[in-house]
């Protein structure tokens, strides 16, 4: 797949982009793991479930607390992905290969990798069981199992992805199909969806819409394209400041938005999508498409739904300030699998990791946690091939911006940060346990003021 060349207008911006790319290339891949998969030891001081962003980051931090030989991570996959870049992969601006490294290369040196899937959690006995039947006990448990994609809850999927006009940026199996569908677009409806469930990176479903609109303009197809965003929500974005900015972009670019529309069926042979109208029970809306981008329904992993650590919706039930489980004091959660009332993003995981590290440090010393997570999360809203609105906010859905300028404005610099600096931070700082979010930068840029 040949990526579309990013449009950067000024010489200063182009120089900045080259600098960031050079830094990323020089850094090279992480080479943190020197051991092999665990085959013998069955008890660990700290056991981490999940090898995604939260799991790897916390395994690294816990290695420093208790020693590598006392930490293990349970993760079945041989590949680790930096998923935020898939928005740009689906729009042809980045290669998929840039988003992947081997799991072996990102697990910290000396930490034991149990390459298996979690089958059962038994927090009352301080142990878990894997698919292979292995029982592993722990003193402290960190749950970082992520979120589950439920494509099968939409009639006609996932088998519908075999057809050429459907894609989804949420799966490694389908993200490149988005780019192919975009390239193959001739005329008609370009349809983008948002489901009636919690999702990871709630801005991503509309990011690909803005990028597609920009691609159509760039290739001369815009006059023949009717761009439609069907969302199950009642608003374009959950933070008013950024919602107002997005509404202006939607108006300027002539995008149609239908609220309370939830995708329930895809008819790929007819190129039709069927939506239920949430505020009109029993009513459906069938829309033909020339291109369809699907954001799937999502939920907590099945293994959590049937476990004692879950709340009524299946998410890990943690204190929203300390990330400690509400019932089991030696169990902790981080990231998408938790019921933290904030947007599920990699930026949120970074901020949570610093809080959780400090929380566990104090608990290990029989002290009360004092560091409190404020719900910080971030969503770089890509609005074009060289424009981003950098949304940052907290539990109260109020802006919590890092930079000393209005981040609701589209900026080239924020696009460069999204496309080049953030991947660098992820691979070289966050996964190594050195990046806990931009709170210290916020204080610096705002001269210590809130």
UniProtKB/Swiss-Prot annotation:
Record's GO cellular component terms: mitochondrial inner membrane; mitochondrion
Transmembrane regions listed in the UniProt entry: none
Active site, UniProt feature: 201 (cysteine persulfide intermediate), 379 (cysteine persulfide intermediate)
GO BP, one annotated term: sulfide oxidation, using sulfide:quinone oxidoreductase
GO MF annotation: an example: quinone binding
Function (record text): Catalyzes the oxidation of hydrogen sulfide with the help of a quinone, such as ubiquinone-10, giving rise to thiosulfate and ultimately to sulfane (molecular sulfur) atoms. Requires an additional electron acceptor; can use sulfite, sulfide or cyanide (in vitro). It is believed the in vivo electron acceptor is glutathione.
Name of the molecule in the record: Sulfide:quinone oxidoreductase, mitochondrial
